[in-house]
Design a protein with these regions (language model features):
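Proteins enriched for Cys/Gly/acidic motifs involved in redox and nucleic-acid/cofactor modification
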Residues: 1-135, 145, 175, 180, ...
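Terminal RNA-binding accessory module
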Residues: 276-370
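Conserved strand-turn element in the central/C-terminal portion of the radical SAM core barrel
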Residues: 88, 92-99, 161-170, 196-207, ...
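A structural micro-motif
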Residues: 3, 26, 52, 159-160, ...
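Conserved, mostly hydrophobic/aromatic
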Residues: 89, 109, 126, 164, ...
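Radical SAM/AdoMet-radical enzyme domain recognition
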Residues: 147-148, 152-161, 173-232
Length: 370
């Protein structure tokens, strides 16, 4: 009975007026006030009157700082470096709810990562609403972008792995890939958001590339890195997606051969261009198409993991797991393939090398330590 119900995030920006009518909600906090949440709650419990005001962040130019020094996962830390998006894909509400691109100052990010490293974390993951846009909002004289940020963080002692969140395919040029491949910490694990393998569908989505350009990006990564993991997102049942368009996407996915695919059924979002498009696809058709691609994803994922059998790899151990009654310590390779070793105390956050000898199940490979 003494708890406060707080509404925060994208839905607040999109439907704040509706939330204000909801008597179950005590506090409404806009996206650009999350950093003040503790203070807002403190004020609320003091006088039960103060509430976060929903602010228009559509034209906000400042990144909201929210520093974290300790994370529940004691091996991998997620570092958000950017917020907002300028892309305006036709199915997406994010530019309206998160505002335009706002990048954190590189010195602030470096300071946070140094603190993370001192706390014992060995791996960081750079994330953002549209990570590839990092730095586009800086003044020209700053000359900062995602690549310069990665190079800066690559120099920090204690950080052994730097993983990237979802990337816009167009950021992957030959120069970009070559520069990444030279770095000590970079993980050859790249999530390139696709959404569709059909050019006609991509055009309706307002994606700013075509299938051939996307494929070229994948080829560049595979030429510059040894057996990189390439993962993606795919939307099925986008308005107007015909059987032939879906078949074209399926053929494209087979040709690229991803490590993992996140398959989403298109969901109508009020306020987006796609919500009012004609030829909305029936739910049953979406489910059929989703099932087809999920089966393909499972097959391709198994095939990619199979390439690691008999190879020497390194895994960063993270947590204990039990498989068929036997306890193991599980972690990930730099490509984000799950590997495990027989359980021992004190292995968490340790890096071990060995050879993958067999699959323990569909997702985890057994590593025999050197």
């Amino acid at each position: 009975p003494s708890a406060a119900v707080v509404a925060v995030g994208c839905y607040v920006q999109a439907a704040g007026a509706e939330l204000k009518k909801d008597e179950a909600v005590d506090l409404i906090v806009g996206n650009n006030q999350k950093k003040d949440l503790v203070q807002i709650l403190d004020d609320y419990f003091t006088d039960h009157e103060n509430s976060g005001e929903i602010l228009d962040i559509g034209h906000s130019q400042e990144y909201e700082e929210l520093h974290i020094r300790r994370i529940a996962d004691h091996t991998r830390a997620f570092i958000k470096v950017q917020d907002g998006c300028n892309q305006f894909c036709s199915y997406c509400i994010i530019p309206y709810t998160r505002g335009r691109v706002r990048s954190r100052r590189p010195e602030d990010i470096e300071h946070e990562v140094r603190g993370i490293a001192e706390a014992g974390y060995k791996e960081i993951v750079l994330t953002g609403i549209h990570l590839s846009s990092y730095g586009v909002d800086f003044k020209d004289e700053q000359q900062e972008n995602l690549l310069t940020l990665i190079k800066r963080l690559d120099q920090i002692p204690g950080i052994e792995r730097l993983r990237l969140g979802s990337l816009e395919p167009r950021i992957v040029t030959r120069e970009f890939a070559k520069e990444l491949a030279r770095l000590r910490t970079i993980c050859p694990h790249f999530h390139l958001s696709l959404q569709s393998g059909c050019d006609a569908t991509l055009k309706r989505m307002n994606r700013r590339y075509n299938a051939a350009e996307y494929q070229a990006c994948c080829e560049i990564l595979r030429e510059e890195f040894d057996n990189p993991a390439i993962t993606t997102d795919v939307i099925v049942g986008f308005p107007g997606e015909t059987e032939e368009e879906f078949a074209e996407t399926e053929r494209f996915l087979k040709a690229i051969h991803f490590y993992e695919m996140h398959i989403f059924k298109y969901s109508r979002r009020a306020g987006t261009l796609a919500a009012d498009m004609p030829d909305q696809v029936p739910e049953g058709t979406k489910s059929v198409r989703s099932d087809i691609l999920l089966a393909l994803e499972k097959q391709q994922s198994l095939e990619y993991r199979g390439r690691f059998l008999g190879t020497e790899e390194e895994i960063l151990l993270e947590e204990p797991i039990e498989i068929d009654g036997t306890k193991y310590m599980m972690g990930h390779t730099r490509q984000y393939v799950k590997g495990a070793v027989p359980y021992e105390e004190g292995l968490k956050n340790k890096t071990v090398k060995g050879i993958f000898t067999k699959a323990l199940n569909e997702e985890v490979l057994l590593l025999e330590k050197e």
